[in-house]
């Protein structure tokens, strides 16, 4: 009986360490590549639900000339407001390149340069913008990487 208790005790101690083994940096980078593809696709489709699914519940978005947008509900409200203001617009082009992916356990960061062209309704000229993003990602208990924090600012187009 004592051996059984010792064995159960050892299993209980070891189980959390085994269950929460963080990904290796190489596998983490591959998983973040998959996250980036989902992020790109959601942005191209201007799909608020798909974009929101990539956020942590307590995520924070830091955009230029705005107060911090804290929490998934606030981020959803912001996305809905922007979508309403852009009624009839569609993404003509979205591309980005991400660099310097750093993985440490269940946390990661990367920075990206993005370019988007949005066709606006009513004959308005298209929006043609460049930006830089710094992303902090967290890998949840379900194994999915999500945005914990984002900071975005304008960028200059690359020189020809």
Predicted regions and their residues:
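Short helix-adjacent coil turns
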Residues: 39, 46-47
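Boundary at the C-terminal end of the N-terminal hydrophobic targeting segment
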Residues: 17-19
């Amino acid at each position: 009986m004592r051996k059984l208790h010792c064995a159960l005790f050892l299993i209980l101690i070891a189980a959390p360490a085994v269950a929460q083994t963080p990904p290796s940096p190489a596998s983490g980078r591959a998983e973040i590549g998959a996250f980036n593809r989902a992020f790109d696709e959601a942005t191209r489709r201007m799909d608020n639900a798909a974009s929101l699914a990539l956020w942590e519940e307590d995520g924070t978005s830091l955009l230029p000339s705005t107060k911090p947008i804290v929490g998934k509900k606030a981020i959803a409200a912001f996305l809905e407001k922007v979508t309403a203001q852009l009624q009839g617009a569609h993404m003509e082009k979205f591309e980005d390149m991400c660099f310097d992916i750093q993985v440490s356990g269940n946390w990661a960061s990367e920075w990206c340069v993005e370019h988007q062209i949005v066709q606006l309704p009513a004959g308005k000229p298209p929006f043609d913008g460049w930006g830089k993003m710094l992303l902090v990602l967290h890998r949840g208990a379900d194994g999915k990487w999500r945005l914990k924090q984002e900071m975005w600012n304008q960028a200059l187009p690359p020189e020809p």
